[in-house]
Design a protein with these regions (language model features):
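Noncatalytic linker/hinge segments flanking ATPase motor cores
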Residues: 26, 30, 53-62, 159-164
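Cytosolic-facing loops and C-terminal tails of multi-pass membrane proteins
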Residues: 69-96, 101, 105, 109, ...
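Peri-catalytic and regulatory segments of divalent metal-dependent proteins
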Residues: 1-49, 53
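Membrane-proximal cytosolic interface modules of multi-pass membrane proteins
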Residues: 1-2, 12, 55, 60-63, ...
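Acidic helix-start/capping segments at beta-turn-to-alpha-helix junctions
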Residues: 51-56, 124-126
Length: 252
């Protein structure tokens, strides 16, 4: 509730992307988590419910004007809504970028500048790679009407072209900043944490272990998340994907 948020007693929920864990070392993983907990420590989530409703209201109002055919340069209502939305977005997103910088600082101080940069690079790259893998996999299983038990370990017959994926990863890492971005550009964030030169107070000898070593049953987690993906595809597109092949069917 709003009252619970104001009192700082609301329950916080941290969502961890399973695909990001693939190939991630424990040290960078801890640094990325420290970034998220940095938001909690700075109470960044306390006022998050205020900016988003304002943004949604402005968008709804603008869409209503546009659908009514009144989104013209001479309509003062449209000019006001459009202009106010842009100003509001610049201010609110600017505040969001500052929150990200301060959370980065917590992460670097806790586990080291190098660990956080490695973790952030990994997360950016995995978002691109997993997006390409998921698209290829879902296109294949939907077209061929195949079951999908584990999205993460599935090997599509036509995997994404590696060169194209590499280019996309590099573009994501070197993306130019915009005043409407909620996060600073990765390049800027790398430069800032490097300038700190923080060794990290929480680094330990076991930081080279795989992040997946923290979880006892990787396959069960991946299958559970695949079930969520299948359900979301069904709800959004009306396409049912089986979770397992029918008895006696051996094709993948």
């Amino acid at each position: 509730s709003i009252l619970a948020h104001a009192r700082g007693r609301a329950e916080r929920c941290l969502i961890l992307g399973v695909a990001a864990l693939d190939g991630m070392r424990l040290g960078p993983f801890k640094a990325v988590l420290a970034h998220e907990y940095g938001h909690f420590s700075n109470r960044d989530t306390a006022g998050g419910e205020f900016a988003l409703p304002v943004r949604r209201s402005l968008l709804t109002m603008g869409e209503g004007i546009a659908r009514g055919g009144a989104a013209t340069w001479y309509n003062p209502a449209w000019l006001f809504v459009n202009g106010f939305y842009r100003v509001f977005l610049r201010i609110s997103q600017g505040a969001s970028r500052l929150q990200e910088v301060l959370a980065d600082r917590w992460a670097a101080l806790s586990y080291g500048s190098r660990a956080f940069e490695e973790g952030l690079r990994h997360v950016v790259a995995r978002e691109v790679r997993f997006g390409a893998h998921a698209s290829a996999t879902l296109d294949e299983v939907i077209t061929a009407k195949r079951p999908l038990e584990n999205l993460y370990s599935y090997k599509p017959e036509r995997p994404p072209i590696e060169r194209g994926v590499e280019v996309s990863v590099q573009e994501a890492l070197e993306a130019k900043p915009s005043p409407y971005d909620s996060h600073p550009s990765p390049v800027d964030r790398f430069a800032w944490v490097r300038a700190m030169g923080a060794p990290g107070t929480g680094a330990s000898a076991g930081d080279d272990a795989e992040a997946w070593s923290l979880f006892p049953d990787r396959d069960a987690i991946e299958r559970a998340m695949t079930a969520v993906v299948r359900r979301n595809v069904a709800q959004a597109n009306g396409i049912e994907i089986a979770g397992a092949a029918p008895p006696g069917r051996l094709d993948s």
